[in-house]
């Protein structure tokens, strides 16, 4: 398995942009926790079968896929149901990430985990890279991107780990405050650093 760098950051911090630059500029393999989280609840998976057995068939669309809106509604006001769902899916997602990481072939791999701090997944990586953005900018970007109100954007931010909590576990920090932030020079330096570290890790 490659040397693993976990990439995290709050909502609208620019994680996807950063990950794509690592991939497009330097050919670094990406493993995205959000993609794996969707994969483990696809039709015919054990994850979706367990969800349907627990919540009933009304949680599915007519085509057999998960009705995410219905599921969100069911767990929103029921912390015990949310806890049940997390207990079911988190081990599946962790295993999916491990499996995907074993398939990577670049000198190091980027493991993209938005909720790294919240789910205490930093042990899955050799290094943690945090994309850091001022919270006011996060709120503005979230409002513009997701077409939500300021109150909704603030609520999303409040539900995530704080900026300080993320920075506390960071080995490396990539600043992405400005609209025209020069990301590539920062990423190039980090890439060179991770290449050197991955060679030492052999």
UniProtKB/Swiss-Prot annotation:
UniProt name for this protein: Dephospho-CoA kinase
Cellular localization per UniProt: Cytoplasm
Family affiliation: Belongs to the CoaE family.
One Gene Ontology CC term in the entry: cytoplasm
CDD domains from the UniProt entry: DPCK (cd02022)
Organism name: Vibrio cholerae serotype O1 (strain ATCC 39315 / El Tor Inaba N16961)
Catalytic activity: 3'-dephospho-CoA + ATP = ADP + CoA + H(+)
Superkingdom of this protein's organism: Bacteria
EC number: 2.7.1.24
Broad class of the protein's primary localization: cytoplasm
Keywords noted in UniProt: ATP-binding, Coenzyme A biosynthesis, Cytoplasm, Kinase, Nucleotide-binding, Transferase
Keyword DNA-binding in record: no
Top-level EC class: transferase
GO MF term list: ATP binding; dephospho-CoA kinase activity
Keyword Transferase attached: yes
GO biological process, one term: coenzyme A biosynthetic process
Task of the protein: Catalyzes the phosphorylation of the 3'-hydroxyl group of dephosphocoenzyme A to form coenzyme A.
InterPro entries referenced in this protein's UniProt entry, alphabetically: Depp_CoAkinase, P-loop_NTPase
Pathway: Cofactor biosynthesis; coenzyme A biosynthesis; CoA from (R)-pantothenate: step 5/5
Gene3D superfamilies associated with the record: P-loop containing nucleotide triphosphate hydrolases
Binding site for ATP: 12-17
Domain DPCK as annotated: residue spans: 4-201
């Amino acid at each position: 398995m490659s040397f693993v760098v976990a990439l995290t950051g709050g909502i609208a911090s620019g994680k996807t942009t950063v990950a794509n630059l690592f991939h497009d500029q330097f050919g670094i393999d990406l493993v995205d926790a959000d993609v794996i989280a969707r994969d483990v609840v696809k039709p015919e998976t054990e994850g979706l079968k367990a969800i349907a057995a627990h919540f009933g068939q009304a949680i599915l669309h007519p085509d057999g896929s998960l009705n995410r809106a219905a599921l969100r509604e069911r767990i929103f006001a029921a912390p015990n149901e949310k806890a049940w769902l997390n207990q079911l899916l988190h081990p599946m997602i962790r295993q999916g990430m491990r499996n995907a990481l074993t398939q990577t072939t670049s000198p190091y791999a980027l493991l993209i985990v938005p909720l790294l701090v919240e789910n205490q997944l930093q042990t899955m990586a050799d290094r943690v890279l945090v994309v850091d953005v001022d919270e006011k900018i996060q709120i503005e970007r979230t409002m513009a991107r997701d077409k939500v109100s300021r109150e909704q954007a603030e609520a999303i931010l409040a539900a995530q780990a704080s900026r300080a909590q993320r920075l506390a576990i960071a080995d490396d920090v990539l600043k992405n405050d400005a609209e025209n932030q020069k990301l590539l020079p920062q990423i190039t330096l980090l890439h060179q650093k991770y290449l050197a570290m991955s060679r030492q890790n052999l």
